Each structure stands twice: as C-alpha cells, then as structure tokens.
Amino acid sequence: LDGRITDVYFERALAILKAKGVNPVVRAEFIAKGLPGGWRWALLTGMEEALTLMGNLKVRVRAMQEGSVFYPYEPVMEIEGRYQDFIVYETAILGLLCQASGVATKASRVKKLAGERLVMSFGARRMHPILAPMIERNAFIGGCDGVAVVKSGELIGWLKPVLPAMAEQAE
C-alpha cells in the first residue's frame, strides 16, 4: 500500500500540515472503544500485516502480539513519530486490524461454543477471492481446525488445506 487507501480527510490534513510547515512528533494509540454485541474481549490479529505496512516508516511502534486477547479501551498499538510520516496509513492500519480481529474473534467464539467438535473455515465461495486467504488465516488463529483454500493453507504453514471436500467424504 502506498497511502492512497486512506480517508480523504487524512490527505487533506496532510496537505494543510505541509502548507503550514507543521510536523509535530505525536503518539497515536489504537484502541477499540467497544466490541460488537457487548462482548468483553476480542482477539487481536492483523498486527503482522500492519507492522509490515509500517516497516519502512520512520516511526516507533509498540504493539500487542498477534493472537493476543484485548479488552475495550486497552491500547493494542502505539505509534510514535512525526505525524506526516504516518498520517495517510491510519485508515489501512485500522482496516487491517479491525477486519482480521473481527474474523478471529468470531471464530474463537464459535469454537468455544462447539466444544470438542471440529470447526472448519469453508467460506471462500461466498467472499471476494482476494480476501479468502486473509479471512481463513484469521479464522484459523481464532480456533478453526481447518481451512478450505490452498493459499490459506500455505499462509498457515500447511502444504495443503486440511478440509476434505464433500465428494471425498461420500466415497
């Protein structure tokens, strides 16, 4: 990502800061003010991608580890640096963390309810194909026992997915 996946107001704010010659060192904390359905906890995922996105930025990052449990108002990440150096990445960072964490958290809750029964991620036919590996990786982190998509299996370190096709089950 090059910063073009940003809310327009960040781009406008950057233009104003540059025009006025203002580039303060700031510290931004990333928190969830609340969780869906009144949930008390969530799983943090998407952090590896967010850190990769910021890898070449001149900022200092402190963050919880991928797969950590977090609570409302608990900072999951802190970025410190000159605001112009990271302002246009805030939208993408939030998107990476929020969607991935939502998938992992929901998978964790489903697995908790399922008890000892297997829970598989098998939704690639109902999502944009580019999203399937990300969604299945985070579902796996959240507790799913298997994934269906080949690329997803590669991302989590399997040579092939562990979810057998229904046709194979019928044999």
Report the location of each language-model feature:
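Flexible, solvent-exposed loop/hinge segments and secondary-structure transition points
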Residues: 1-87, 92
